[in-house]
Amino acid sequence: MVDQIHYVTRFLLKEFMSGNAPKMKPVHKKVVYHTPCHLERSGNVMFTIELLKMVPGLELVVLDSECCGLAGTYGFKEENYEVSKKIGSHLFDAIQTSDADYAVTDCETCKWQIEENAHLETIHPVSLLAMALIDELVLERE
Protein backbone atom coordinates (compact mmCIF):
# COMPACT_ATOMS: atom_id res chain seq x y z
CA MET A 1 0.00 0.00 0.00
CA VAL A 2 2.79 2.46 0.84
CA ASP A 3 4.00 2.21 -2.77
CA GLN A 4 0.62 3.59 -3.88
CA ILE A 5 0.79 6.75 -1.73
CA HIS A 6 2.72 9.79 -2.95
CA TYR A 7 3.16 13.26 -1.56
CA VAL A 8 1.13 15.74 -3.63
CA THR A 9 4.07 17.70 -5.06
CA ARG A 10 5.86 14.47 -5.96
CA PHE A 11 2.75 13.27 -7.79
CA LEU A 12 2.31 16.59 -9.61
CA LEU A 13 5.96 16.85 -10.61
CA LYS A 14 5.88 13.33 -12.02
CA GLU A 15 2.76 14.21 -14.02
CA PHE A 16 4.25 17.46 -15.29
CA MET A 17 7.48 15.76 -16.33
CA SER A 18 5.46 13.07 -18.14
CA GLY A 19 3.98 15.70 -20.42
CA ASN A 20 0.83 16.39 -18.43
CA ALA A 21 1.75 19.90 -17.32
CA PRO A 22 -1.09 22.41 -17.51
CA LYS A 23 -0.74 25.71 -19.32
CA MET A 24 0.52 28.31 -16.88
CA LYS A 25 0.62 32.08 -16.89
CA PRO A 26 3.46 34.01 -15.25
CA VAL A 27 3.22 34.66 -11.54
CA HIS A 28 5.36 37.75 -11.04
CA LYS A 29 5.93 37.30 -7.32
CA LYS A 30 8.91 36.75 -5.08
CA VAL A 31 8.46 33.87 -2.67
CA VAL A 32 10.60 32.33 0.01
CA TYR A 33 10.28 28.58 0.47
CA HIS A 34 10.55 27.05 3.94
CA THR A 35 11.34 23.34 4.05
CA PRO A 36 9.31 21.56 6.75
CA CYS A 37 11.49 19.32 8.93
CA HIS A 38 9.44 16.19 8.29
CA LEU A 39 9.47 16.74 4.52
CA GLU A 40 13.23 17.11 4.50
CA ARG A 41 13.70 13.98 6.61
CA SER A 42 11.47 11.98 4.26
CA GLY A 43 13.43 13.12 1.21
CA ASN A 44 10.44 14.75 -0.48
CA VAL A 45 11.46 18.42 -0.47
CA MET A 46 13.18 18.27 -3.87
CA PHE A 47 9.83 17.55 -5.53
CA THR A 48 8.27 20.74 -4.17
CA ILE A 49 11.27 22.87 -5.13
CA GLU A 50 11.39 21.48 -8.67
CA LEU A 51 7.64 21.98 -9.07
CA LEU A 52 7.89 25.61 -7.93
CA LYS A 53 10.73 26.19 -10.41
CA MET A 54 8.27 25.33 -13.20
CA VAL A 55 6.03 28.32 -12.42
CA PRO A 56 6.83 31.00 -15.01
CA GLY A 57 7.80 34.42 -13.70
CA LEU A 58 8.22 33.21 -10.12
CA GLU A 59 11.25 34.41 -8.17
CA LEU A 60 11.93 31.51 -5.83
CA VAL A 61 14.28 31.81 -2.87
CA VAL A 62 14.87 28.55 -1.03
CA LEU A 63 15.67 29.39 2.57
CA ASP A 64 18.27 27.51 4.57
CA SER A 65 16.67 24.49 6.17
CA GLU A 66 15.71 25.47 9.72
CA CYS A 67 13.01 24.36 12.12
CA CYS A 68 10.20 26.87 12.58
CA GLY A 69 10.10 25.87 16.25
CA LEU A 70 6.58 24.55 16.39
CA ALA A 71 7.63 20.88 16.23
CA GLY A 72 4.20 19.35 15.93
CA THR A 73 2.30 20.44 19.03
CA TYR A 74 5.38 21.41 21.07
CA GLY A 75 5.06 25.13 20.40
CA PHE A 76 1.33 25.14 21.08
CA LYS A 77 1.93 24.35 24.73
CA GLU A 78 2.04 27.47 26.87
CA GLU A 79 5.18 26.36 28.70
CA ASN A 80 7.03 25.91 25.38
CA TYR A 81 5.80 29.00 23.54
CA GLU A 82 8.81 31.27 24.14
CA VAL A 83 11.32 28.48 23.41
CA SER A 84 9.39 27.68 20.24
CA LYS A 85 9.68 31.28 19.05
CA LYS A 86 13.38 31.35 19.89
CA ILE A 87 14.02 28.15 17.91
CA GLY A 88 12.41 29.71 14.83
CA SER A 89 13.76 33.25 15.29
CA HIS A 90 16.52 32.99 12.67
CA LEU A 91 14.01 31.68 10.13
CA PHE A 92 11.55 34.47 10.95
CA ASP A 93 14.30 37.10 10.56
CA ALA A 94 15.28 35.65 7.16
CA ILE A 95 11.67 35.79 6.00
CA GLN A 96 11.08 39.32 7.29
CA THR A 97 14.18 40.68 5.53
CA SER A 98 13.52 38.82 2.27
CA ASP A 99 11.15 41.38 0.73
CA ALA A 100 9.04 38.43 -0.46
CA ASP A 101 5.40 38.63 -1.45
CA TYR A 102 4.66 35.26 0.17
CA ALA A 103 6.29 32.56 2.21
CA VAL A 104 5.59 29.06 0.91
CA THR A 105 5.65 25.85 2.91
CA ASP A 106 4.12 22.40 2.61
CA CYS A 107 3.28 22.20 6.33
CA GLU A 108 0.19 23.77 7.85
CA THR A 109 1.71 24.09 11.33
CA CYS A 110 4.82 25.75 9.88
CA LYS A 111 2.43 28.11 8.07
CA TRP A 112 0.80 29.12 11.35
CA GLN A 113 4.15 29.67 13.06
CA ILE A 114 5.57 31.71 10.17
CA GLU A 115 2.49 33.92 9.83
CA GLU A 116 2.36 34.52 13.58
CA ASN A 117 6.03 35.38 13.95
CA ALA A 118 7.27 36.62 10.56
CA HIS A 119 4.03 38.44 9.73
CA LEU A 120 3.97 37.34 6.09
CA GLU A 121 1.13 35.55 4.33
CA THR A 122 2.18 31.93 3.96
CA ILE A 123 0.68 29.59 1.39
CA HIS A 124 0.93 25.96 0.32
CA PRO A 125 2.87 25.18 -2.88
CA VAL A 126 -0.32 23.89 -4.54
CA SER A 127 -2.02 27.23 -3.83
CA LEU A 128 0.84 28.99 -5.58
CA LEU A 129 0.58 26.59 -8.49
CA ALA A 130 -3.15 27.37 -8.71
CA MET A 131 -2.28 31.06 -9.18
CA ALA A 132 -0.41 30.10 -12.35
CA LEU A 133 -3.08 27.93 -13.92
CA ILE A 134 -4.71 29.28 -17.02
CA ASP A 135 -8.45 28.81 -17.03
CA GLU A 136 -9.14 27.46 -20.51
CA LEU A 137 -12.89 28.09 -20.17
CA VAL A 138 -12.32 31.77 -19.41
CA LEU A 139 -9.99 32.08 -22.41
CA GLU A 140 -12.59 30.50 -24.71
CA ARG A 141 -15.22 33.04 -23.62
CA GLU A 142 -12.98 36.04 -24.26
For each predicted feature, which ranges?
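Iron-sulfur cluster-binding electron-transfer modules in prokaryotic oxidoreductases
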Residues: 1-142
